[in-house]
Design a protein with these regions (language model features):
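Glycine-enriched alpha-helix->loop->beta-strand junction motifs that scaffold or abut catalytic
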Residues: 99, 123, 130-134, 153-158, ...
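An N-terminally biased module of ancient metal coordination in phosphate/nucleic-acid-related enzymes
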Residues: 1-63
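Hydrophobic faces of well-ordered beta-strands that scaffold small-molecule active sites
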Residues: 13-17, 44-46, 65-71, 102-105, ...
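Active-site gating/metal-coordination segments in enzymes
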Residues: 7, 51-136, 189-192, 198-199
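H/E-rich (His + Asp/Glu) clusters that bind or coordinate divalent metals
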Residues: 158, 166-280
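Acidic/histidine-rich helix-loop elements
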Residues: 17-28, 75-82, 111, 194-198, ...
Length: 280
């Protein structure tokens, strides 16, 4: 009996992955590349802590993996980057080398007292403008109004908004995208195991999302954001086995994407990322 022909999945632009120190402990760069290739991820953006690991993954893969410069120079910098002037200097060196293709992911939490006027934050934004590279930003705010003044002040910067504001609903996302034409939005980590609020228990898009994706079909992208167990208090005390869950994450994205009109699905799955990276 002949076996059914293998059908390769559609090419996928995974615009939000990580290869961090606590992931490298259990998954090598070559293993990450193999998993990406197995799922036909043809264009990938990676940020790493420390930043050099993004270069390591890009070297293992080739030009289809684009390394971003992470402001987290060590595993401790996620909570201290905003008070370390060396972050801007190191980012400037990284971008001047030509090897890093963007800045981020940068977590901006107003609840932690970070003000929009913060010197390090603005220094990084100025670098993005100077080198004309994208800025991957993760905001943790109850309203889109926190981020609006930033993307308006730096109108020359191409922002990629991680997780569509995490828990914000389509109406708030719509308002921000109207206010900031330089803002692109991605919905990584909106899966049921982390932020959620994109699909219901049957994996169907929740009200408002389909309409939002169609309205801004040229400015949405997606990615898997393979980080696992990050809601646990002791998250950084253990190795991160997220890459063992990559199939689960990417298949979930492929499923909800199929609920969109074919031309919109292809844009969000692939072609928007290509245009975003090229600056078009």
């Amino acid at each position: 009996m002949s076996r059914p022909a293998y059908s390769e999945p559609e090419p996928f632009a995974d615009i939000h992955i990580h290869f961090n120190w606590d992931q490298k402990e259990v998954t090598s760069a070559s293993e990450v590349v193999a998993r990406l290739r197995a799922h036909n991820a043809v264009l990938v953006q990676v940020s790493s802590t420390p930043p050099r690991l993004a270069l390591e993954l890009a070297d293992a893969a080739g030009p289809w993996v684009l390394p971003y410069f992470s402001p987290y120079l060590t595993e401790r910098h996620r909570t201290t980057w905003a008070v370390d002037d060396n972050v801007v200097a190191e980012a400037a060196k990284g971008l001047a080398s030509g090897r890093y293709k963007g800045i981020g992911e940068l977590h901006v939490f107003p609840d932690n007292g970070l003000r929009r006027e913060n010197k390090v934050f603005n220094g990084l934004l100025q670098l993005a403008a100077r080198y004309q590279v994208p800025f991957l930003i993760h905001t943790e705010a109850s309203s889109h109004l926190f981020f609006a003044p930033v993307c308006q002040k730096y109108s020359q910067v191409r922002f990629l908004w991680a997780h569509a504001g995490n828990r914000l609903q389509p109406d708030a996302i719509d308002q921000l995208m109207q206010q900031c034409p330089n803002l692109w939005t991605e919905v990584s980590a909106r899966d049921p195991w982390r932020y959620g609020k994109l699909t219901d228990s049957d994996n169907l898009l929740l009200p408002g999302w389909r309409e939002l994706f169609i309205k801004y079909q040229d400015r949405f992208m997606t990615g898997t954001d393979p980080v696992w167990g990050n809601s646990e208090d002791n998250r950084y005390a253990n190795a991160d086995e997220a890459w063992d869950h990559y199939t689960q994450l990417i298949e979930w994205h492929r499923n909800w994407l199929k609920q969109l009109p074919p031309e919109v699905e292809e844009k969000i799955r692939l072609t928007n990322a290509r245009k975003f990276i090229s600056g078009n």
